[in-house]
Amino acid sequence: SKSYSQIWVQLSIKDSLIWILFVEYDNEIRVRLRSRYVPVVDIASQFNGGGHANASGATVYNKKQMKLLLETADNKLKNYKSENPELF
């Protein structure tokens, strides 16, 4: 599908650590989370989802939850960078 092909475009962006794609359906918003290094499965599990360490999915139901997911991902990324300074 189109949303999956967009993930592959995002993966080609060098220096990006986490990619998040929101796909809106009638009653829900599906979230695709991908990462090169930062584990994203714990983010997905907080939002009705799961998957693999670096490729996960979740479901949110409104813009407030979308914003909360983005804030959660930002915090995860900040923590990852501070715990792994040699990578940056």
Q: Which residues make up each language-model segment?
A:
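Gly/His-enriched, cation/cofactor- and phosphate-binding structural elements
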Residues: 1-88
